[in-house]
Amino acid sequence: MACILKRKPVLVVSFIALCILLLAMRLVNDATFPLLLNCFGQPKTKWIPLPYTFRQPLRTHYGYINVRTQEPLQLNCNHCAIVSNSGQMVGQKVGEEIDHASCIWRMNNAPTKGFEEDVGYMTMVRVVSHTSVPLLLKNPDYFFKEASRTIYVIWGPFRNMRKDGNGIVYNMLKKTVDAYPDAQIYVTTEQQMTHCDRVFKDETGKDRVQSGSYLSTGWFTFILAMDACYSIHVYGMINETYCKTEGYRKVPYHYYEQGKDECNEYLLHEHAPYGGHRFITEKKVFAKWAKKHRIVFTHPNWTLS
């Protein structure tokens, strides 16, 4: 009897230690947890990431300047969810999972209202092309009043973003912050735009301008997210071979509108002699980055060789 009583404290301590170990493993591997589930034959297991708080003081990103205050962006996230605009998101029902991330990133004018079950309803960072700014301004109350806590990062060429009164998009943004003083709108600096072009050339061996292409909003999103996030979970983005896969799922280019077929649009842009986005080429680079950073792609899952 005495031996049994002596063992009880040992068993309790061991049990507590095991629980702490499992929790630590979950925290460390949260970014890759969906893939670990797949390894154990649970590809359909619902994964809800643990809620995070900022893990350290906000980090300053000097390539992004606030339109109203002219101060650089300060942002630092633990677990980021990047939600693709792709029709792949239709019917996925991962909105609750997405909203558990510490920072939820969206692109251009992709809405959440009416699509919450699939894509969630929260947005912390929205990266927007200069060409999509007029689309935001069609519904300014929704984007800049109701979503005043969202950080907007606008990218675009110098001719549209110049601050001397001749930058047509910058002028739109100035008027927007005058009308919505709480709006957090940042623009990408000319130096940061050059940096993004340089990264494209370093990764692909091709000069973006000479190849007649434009970087996508996804490219600018990844550049900032890899600098601001400890781990990244990308939802709804296809890889570079998806459209060549037999029996692939045909979906709209955007989850929020019918019309263009995603794969047709990708192939059209990839081979356009001028003015296209090299979506497929970019996906090859994203796969390369995922091997070096804590990046996971799901819905559909990516296999990184």
From Swiss-Prot:
One of its GO terms (biological process) is glycosylceramide metabolic process. Glycans are attached at residues 239, 301. It is an enzyme of class 2 (transferase). It is a single-pass type II membrane protein. It comes from the Eukaryota. The keyword Cytoplasm does not apply. Residues 29-305 are lumenal. Disulfide bonds join 80-229. This is Alpha-N-acetylgalactosaminide alpha-2,6-sialyltransferase 3. It comes from Mus musculus (Mouse). The gene is St6galnac3.
